[in-house]
Amino acid sequence: MIQSRRINVIVVISVLLSLIVSIFLIVMGNIQKEDKDTRTEPLYATKLFGTDIISVEIIADEVEWQKMLENAMNEEFIMADVIVNGTKFEKVGIRPKGNSSLSQVAQSDSQRYSFRLQFDKYVKGQTCFGLTSFVVNNMLGDNTYMKEYISYDLMKEIGVDAPYFGFSNISVNGKEWGLYLAVELYNDSYEQRVFGDASGMLYNVKSMDMGGNNADGNAGRMPDAVPDGAFPAAPDGGGSGNFTPDMEKNIKGEFSVEGIRFEGRQPGGMGGGRGSNGGSLEYTDDNVSNYSAIFNNVVGKGTEADYKRVIEALKALNEGRDLEKYFDVDQILRYLAAHTIVVNLDSYSSSMAQNYYIYEKDGQLTVLPWDYNLSWGGFQSGDASDVINFPIDTPVSGVEMSSRPLIERLFENEEYLNSYHEYLQELVDKYFADGRFESKINKISALIDEYVKNDATAFCTYEQYKTAVSSFNLLGRLRGESVQGQLDGAIASTASGQKENHGTLISAGDLKLSDLGSMMGGRGQRSSEGSEAQDTFADGINDVQAGRGPGRQQSQDINSGFIQNRQQTGNYKYLILAGALMGVLITSILLAAKLKRNY
């Protein structure tokens, strides 16, 4: 029998033990939180993407460099030293990159290719401040130098998990080369900083197959656009542009245009039959081969089990069930809000059904933005009015809503549709209202103006750039006004409604989309004695600091768009931890009371 004088000692020891356990759990929780915060703010966030203009100096053997350029279509790496923002990295792999943009430049007098830099290609384990590879894109198709930049800044503003991106001034062997866009690739580094680990799966969705040797962004070999002549340039005349399905007809069968193999569609992408290759996210059956647009472009290696999880989610989507189980609905609604505003039709929103990433973990999917150089009406658009008034509630072109289940199923849900409208309103308020869009464009222009003026290999003249910036200012302002009008009900928010009430649409006036640059809008090239190579570049997305001058001190809040969502998950973990601690304390007290009572 325990002597009564020992009971108090036992009680004290029990309580002390519970406190020790509690303190231990709290300390471990804080350590885990610190580790997570470290993962979400890698060194390359500040060292690489934390400056106004990223400086990239390439030092390569002249003979090897020229040989690489002359054989760019082979996409073969050469070894070079690279100085990034003053830090030298030796034996870095570099090669041309792109798809149709690569062939377009190769067929011109220009050598202004987009490039991929692979820091561990020749030196195992080497990184650029923790990043194994990134790309620099060459501004093809964008006289403004900032359409994609702004598109992804909008994504970041509304909380989408976009990659880091920033303007980059390139030099080669001491000579100025040009102003590019540096882009973080979707890979393990991205997963680690955004999701806390690299255990998920990434798929680069591309719906057309095109010849080539290497995949950009660690994905399958797919084009960012199509060769010259395969698709029409955006006209500046009248017409209903994207909103009349009868102007776009499906052609069954297969044919090719300059090496591109089309399945069930005419050039211009007017096909996309139900579940033809998975890019539409329509469920066909459980056969992996029927989703080639997704699984042919896996980042890294995938297994049959990985693919089956995606197909299971697509089946649920098409059946309209368990959406929040299989999809990160809130993140996708944010993505759709920004995506709709910028009118990118070389995407899921059109018959192309491509140019986005799928991230899958534990059976749940989300969509990540990619390849917005042809946004703001640079692809398949009618006239400027079509872009300005692009309908927010039927944001598709050349296809029916029913063939884009990710949009249709979410918009069928009144709660989800209301959230989508709230995100649109938030973007209008923060990004467009009261001259905010014009202010941001002017700040970015002030940052890059001298670089553009002195861009030795530019695809447009400095005067054309200035005209493009002015036109972009107007386009953005009018687009913001139209979205606000659609949210208020003053302008119809569906394609059919706009057709019936055409008089309520906002007029574009004399605005010409071609002034901004488009896929086929050849503008000449300063370094090529008037050659007119013009196309789209692949895989470009940059980061800019929301609400401030572009690129300045991005490290302080560059992750603001996604950290809040991730911290919510962390808060739930701490609630569980608090509950566990409470259980330990209660158990200890009850045990002590029982001992006191018994003895």
Protein language model regions, located:
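Phosphate/dinucleotide-binding and metal-coordinating scaffold of catalytic cores
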Residues: M1-Y599
